[in-house]
Amino acid sequence: MKKLSILLIAGAMAVACSNGKHAEFEKNTEAAKAYFKLHETENAEEMFTYLSDDLTWHMPGYGMGIGGIEEVKAAILGYQAGFDNMVFTADYWLPGVDTETGVPDGSTRVYGTWTSVYVETGQELSLTSYHSFEFKDGKIINGGDWFDLGGMMNSLVPAPVEVIETETME
């Protein structure tokens, strides 16, 4: 009986702990959704209030590595200057896990698609992406963007114009 009681108590504690992390995941997911909505409305200054000063962020471009808050702010401003009608459509939001233990930690991640219009040419764009968000004290402290930034930018370059040389008769 004593062993059964211990098992029941341990099980109840495990459920209580996981429910707490699930509530944290739900809260953080809502914050990440709000952050993306601000990106859609091009409200960079309000987006910046979601970011911790100690932010570390996986940047999406080849060779960019890990950026800090200034690099992320510059990227946000660049996207908002270069693209109109930005809309993120999530396929699904998933709970994140502690990278060392594999235990849910309240972080959130999402797979989805960004659509927008490139300002310079009016070209419509659709970009599949993955984003992760870790929070500390209600602010985004760590995470990243994973998508084909180079491919996206290459798709926006106009196709070369073929020049046909003709002979002139004099």
Question: Predicted segments — roles?
Answer:
Residues 4-14:
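Sec-dependent N-terminal signal peptides
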Residues 17-170:
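C-terminal and inter-domain tail/linker signature
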